[in-house]
Amino acid sequence: VGGTFFVFADYMRPAIRLAALSKARIIFVFTHDSVGVGEDGPTHQPIEHLASLRVIPGLQVIRPADSNETKVAWECALTYPGPTALVLSRQSLPITTDGDAVRYGAEIVVESAKAQIVLVGTGSEVSVCVDAAKLLKDSGVEASVVSMPSFDRFEMQPSQYRDSVFP
């Protein structure tokens, strides 16, 4: 296990890539994710880092929305046959999930039978999506919210499950 602020992930990129190529069972813990660390200024806002890690073949990337997802993310990282990047926020986040989204890659956390739109978030933005869904509902727009902590894990699910999350 190794860790640093997420904005410094670029300094670790060669080691992360080599770990993925060699299927090394390493857990990289990155903290201080999201624009929620605004008081540190733009040099400490890791805007593009998540996308760049997600394209490394063999690297499992998990960005939990809350402590429930973080617990399950650790379980998944400990059993994954290769490296995992756990991308964690700095700020305290409300509990918005039961944690199962991590196992499946994505899960509906706010369901509306009459949803006109689906808001998708990862990490700290899931709670923002939940708040946005409430505001939309007050304006007469029904919305569902999906937490998607791991694109790769979601893509591995059967099409029936994927279609149930995104009808």
Tell me what each language-model feature is.
Residues 22, 56-57:
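Short, structured coil segments at secondary-structure junctions
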Residues 8, 64-71, 127:
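Active-site glycine- and acidic-residue-rich loops that bind
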Residues 58, 62-65, 75, 82, ...:
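Active-site core segments that coordinate phosphate-bearing ligands/cofactors
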Residues 27-31, 64, 87-89, 120-121:
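Short beta-strand segments
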Residues 2-4, 60-63, 120:
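Short catalytic-loop micro-motif centered on adjacent basic/acidic residues
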Residues 1-50, 70, 78-167:
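Thiamine diphosphate
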